[in-house]
């Protein structure tokens, strides 16, 4: 696991070394490089696409968020895997209601993947462990 010491970036290229497979995933027009460019160009604010999604929720706790820190490729230990999962961007934010932590999965033109029902039907034992763990953490059991 990487150290939990964070160094501010000077450009999007600083994000490349944090990828699980930097040479494979760092390509123009793909999600990793596009995400870095988007967040870097918006700093110190949240990207407008994120603001719009949160505004659509109509939840006042998700409105007028101030970005405190954006951490690229945040590693999350989940059961059932042989390596940590990586969140594209972990954003620490706040507003008058308090602190909000956002986990962002960024996509350019890729699919998010199969639905949970489809994934569960073909899940390996490790994937099943992860799904069950997340369902329990989010208090949303599949049954």
Residue spans for each PLM region:
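Short, well-structured alpha-helical interface segments that form or flank functional binding sites
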Residues: 82-87, 99, 143
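Acidic, metal/cofactor-coordinating or nucleic-acid-engaging core segments within structured domains
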Residues: 112-143
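Conserved beta-strand->loop/alpha-helix structural units within folded catalytic cores of enzymes
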Residues: 86-90, 106
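Active-site beta-strand-loop-beta-strand hairpin of nuclease catalytic cores
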Residues: 91-103
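Nuclease-adjacent, charged terminal/linker segments that flank catalytic cores
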Residues: 1-79, 84
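Generic hydrophobic, helix-prone segments enriched in Leu/Val/Ile
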Residues: 67-70, 100, 131-138
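Short loop/turn segments at strand-loop or loop-helix junctions that form parts
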Residues: 103-110, 138
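Short glycine-rich, polar/acidic loop-and-turn segments at beta strand-coil junctions
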Residues: 72, 93-95, 108
């Amino acid at each position: 696991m990487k150290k939990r010491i964070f160094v501010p970036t000077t450009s999007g290229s600083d994000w490349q070394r944090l990828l699980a497979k930097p040479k494979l995933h760092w390509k123009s027009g793909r999600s990793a490089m596009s995400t870095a460019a988007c967040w870097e160009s918006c700093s110190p604010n949240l990207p407008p696409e994120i603001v719009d999604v949160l505004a659509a929720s109509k939840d006042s706790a998700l409105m007028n968020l101030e970005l405190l820190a954006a951490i690229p490729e945040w590693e999350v230990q989940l059961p059932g895997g042989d390596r940590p999962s990586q969140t594209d961007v972990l954003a620490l934010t706040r507003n008058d209601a308090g602190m909000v932590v956002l986990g962002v999965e960024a996509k350019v033109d890729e699919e998010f993947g199969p639905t949970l029902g489809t994934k569960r039907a073909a899940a390996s034992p490790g994937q099943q462990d992860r799904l069950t763990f997340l369902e329990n953490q989010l208090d949303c059991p599949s049954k």
